[in-house]
């Protein structure tokens, strides 16, 4: 990677998240907007990326071909869909480009492809790039170690009507953090739906509930409920800019790293807290 400004490419540049990623890239010192990508046939192709994001003219035009921009970026930032992200991943691996991946909804094969690619390129892969959410994940680990063995644990998440995967990647990351702290595998203790005559709650399980409504940016709560008291740890996002800023910060953090798989806790140095 270059010693000067880190040049980033933004996938899905015309989407809500893409536009805010462009704004964040233009605002952070040490980062340069190098390229912007949209799907083939999109009406926004050829538009100035800065103007598209409401940040003024930049001279960076929205392209549809990775080959056309391969010399214009060092790190590729992707918050699109799993199938598109995996195509971008293969290209970045082939050409030695770093990646910041905020896409959610991967199956196990997709996650394994990311792990495999990290042998050759540096990747930050996180379910949520908010600083607050990642601090919350650390708090959940601590709470689970103290309270998890004798409380009922439930995770409730809410997002806008357009979100296509459930539970959210962040909710799953919360469950993983709690399960790991309890020396469990989430797939063995997660309960993703309850309907009809379910019987009493099974001890030691982690329940999930999902809301999809309106324009909710993202709300996540973990509940540790006992008889007579409960602890709730909640994060609420009011703007996607918190995710965009974290993603661009992660791209800058990748400077000088040739390979490896990282998450936001690495970026924020939270692992040792």
From Swiss-Prot:
Belongs to the DapB family. The active site is at residues 159, 163. Homotetramer. (S)-2,3,4,5-tetrahydrodipicolinate binds at residues 160, 169-170. Pathway: Amino-acid biosynthesis; L-lysine biosynthesis via DAP pathway; (S)-tetrahydrodipicolinate from L-aspartate: step 4/4. Keywords: Amino-acid biosynthesis, Cytoplasm, Diaminopimelate biosynthesis, Lysine biosynthesis, NAD, NADP, Oxidoreductase. NAD(+) binds at residues 12-17, 38, 102-104, 126-129. Its EC number is 1.17.1.8. Pfam families: DapB_C, DapB_N. GO terms for cellular component: cytosol. GO terms for biological process: diaminopimelate biosynthetic process; lysine biosynthetic process via diaminopimelate. Its main location: cytoplasm. Gene3D superfamilies: Dihydrodipicolinate Reductase, domain 2, NAD(P)-binding Rossmann-like Domain. PROSITE patterns: DAPB. The keyword RNA-binding does not apply. GO terms for molecular function: 4-hydroxy-tetrahydrodipicolinate reductase; NAD binding; NADP binding; oxidoreductase activity, acting on CH or CH2 groups, NAD or NADP as acceptor. It is an enzyme of class 1 (oxidoreductase). It is found in: Cytoplasm. This is 4-hydroxy-tetrahydrodipicolinate reductase. NCBIfam families: dapB. Catalyzes the conversion of 4-hydroxy-tetrahydrodipicolinate (HTPA) to tetrahydrodipicolinate. It catalyses: (S)-2,3,4,5-tetrahydrodipicolinate + NAD(+) + H2O = (2S,4S)-4-hydroxy-2,3,4,5-tetrahydrodipicolinate + NADH + H(+); (S)-2,3,4,5-tetrahydrodipicolinate + NADP(+) + H2O = (2S,4S)-4-hydroxy-2,3,4,5-tetrahydrodipicolinate + NADPH + H(+). The keyword NADP applies.
């Amino acid at each position: 990677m270059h010693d000067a400004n880190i040049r980033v490419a933004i996938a899905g540049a015309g989407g809500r998240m893409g536009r805010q990623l462009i704004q964040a890239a233009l605002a952070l010192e040490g980062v340069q907007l190098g390229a912007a990508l949209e799907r083939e046939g999109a009406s926004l192709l050829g538009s100035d990326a800065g103007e598209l994001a409401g940040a003024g003219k930049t001279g960076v035009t929205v392209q549809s071909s990775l080959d056309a921009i391969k010399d214009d970026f060092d790190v590729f930032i992707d918050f699109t869909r799993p199938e598109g992200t995996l195509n971008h991943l293969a290209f970045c691996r082939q050409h030695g480009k770093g990646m910041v991946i905020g896409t959610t909804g991967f199956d196990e094969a997709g996650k394994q492809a990311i792990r495999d690619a990290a042998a050759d390129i540096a990747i930050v892969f996180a379910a949520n790039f908010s600083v607050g959410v990642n601090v919350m994940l650390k708090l959940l680990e601590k709470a689970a170690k103290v309270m998890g063995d004798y409380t009922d644990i439930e995770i409730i998440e809410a997002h806008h009507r357009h979100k296509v995967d459930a539970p959210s990647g962040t909710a799953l990351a919360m469950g993983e953090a709690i399960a790991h702290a309890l020396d469990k595998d989430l797939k063995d203790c997660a309960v993703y739906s309850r309907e009809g005559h379910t019987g009493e709650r099974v001890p030691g399980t982690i329940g999930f509930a999902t809301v999809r409504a309106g324009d909710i940016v993202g709300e996540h709560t973990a509940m540790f409920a006992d008889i007579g008291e409960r602890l709730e740890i909640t994060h609420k996002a009011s703007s996607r800019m918190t995710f965009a800023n974290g993603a661009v910060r992660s791209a800058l953090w990748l400077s000088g790293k040739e390979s490896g798989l990282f998450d936001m806790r690495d970026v924020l140095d939270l692992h040792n807290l």
